[in-house]
């Protein structure tokens, strides 16, 4: 009778093992199904992220292309503006000189003019020209009696004199300054000490 009694625990043990196996299989299948379900969710989520990233990349690329084109357009406009500034830089100055030319033409058109009227006309024309020069900051360099300045004067000759050496004794041709830049130096004679 002991054998049947021993068989019962063996059978119970087998049943218990079978239940454990079934539970493991069931939980394994459940885990596998959960993993598959998660993969199914993860894959569409990654695909969505990829699509969004591709859209953003395309938008950034388009924005970059537009910015590049705009930069190129700005560069071309700047080059055109600079070229026009160089080309037409003296436009206003030239317009002001037209009045001087008109005065000279009017003086030449007078048939029976006297020397006095010609002189008066030339004097008025010179005043017009001086006004244009003043307006555009063109100033005369007339250094008579001043110390020689090689930045503004060009010595044409030296003359022995009693006045201090390196003094301008004669202005042969006036010079001109535009703002602070010498556009033509004054042509001058400069004193030197008398030789003994």
Curated annotation (Swiss-Prot):
Record key words, sorted: Chaperone, Cytoplasm, Stress response
GO biological process: protein folding
A single Gene Ontology CC term: cytosol
Region of interest (Disordered), ranges: 1-40
Start-end of Basic and acidic residues biased regions: 1-26
InterPro entries: GrpE, GrpE_coiled_coil, GrpE_head
Keyword Phosphoprotein: no
Gene Ontology molecular-function annotations: adenyl-nucleotide exchange factor activity; protein homodimerization activity; protein-folding chaperone binding; unfolded protein binding
Record-linked Pfam families: GrpE (PF01025)
Compartments, as annotated in UniProt: Cytoplasm
Stored NCBIfam families: PRK14139.1 (NF010737), PRK14140.1 (NF010738), PRK14150.1 (NF010748)
Family: Belongs to the GrpE family.
Function: Participates actively in the response to hyperosmotic and heat shock by preventing the aggregation of stress-denatured proteins, in association with DnaK and GrpE. It is the nucleotide exchange factor for DnaK and may function as a thermosensor. Unfolded proteins bind initially to DnaJ; upon interaction with the DnaJ-bound protein, DnaK hydrolyzes its bound ATP, resulting in the formation of a stable complex. GrpE releases ADP from DnaK; ATP binding to DnaK triggers the release of the substrate protein, thus completing the reaction cycle.
Subunit structure: Homodimer.
Protein name: Protein GrpE
Organism placement in taxonomy: Bacteria, Pseudomonadati, Pseudomonadota, Betaproteobacteria, Nitrosomonadales
């Amino acid at each position: 009778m002991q054998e049947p009694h021993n068989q019962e625990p063996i059978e119970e043990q087998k049943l218990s093992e079978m239940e454990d196996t079934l539970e493991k299989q069931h939980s394994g299948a459940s885990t596998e199904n959960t993993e598959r379900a998660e993969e199914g969710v993860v894959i569409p989520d990654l695909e969505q992220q990829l699509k969004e990233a591709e859209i953003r990349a395309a938008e950034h690329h388009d924005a970059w292309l537009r910015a590049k084109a705009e930069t190129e357009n700005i560069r071309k406009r700047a080059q055109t503006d600079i070229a026009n500034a160089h080309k037409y830089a003296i436009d206003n100055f030239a317009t002001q000189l037209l009045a001087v030319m008109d005065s000279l033409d009017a003086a030449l058109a007078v048939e029976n003019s006297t020397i006095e009227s010609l002189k008066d006309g030339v004097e008025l024309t010179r005043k017009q020209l001086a006004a244009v020069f003043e307006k555009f900051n063109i100033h005369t360099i007339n250094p008579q009696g001043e110390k020689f300045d090689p930045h503004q004067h060009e010595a044409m000759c030296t003359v022995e004199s009693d006045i201090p050496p390196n003094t301008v004794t004669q202005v042969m041709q006036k010079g001109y300054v535009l703002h602070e830049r010498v556009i033509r130096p004054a042509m001058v004679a400069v004193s030197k000490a008398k030789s003994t």
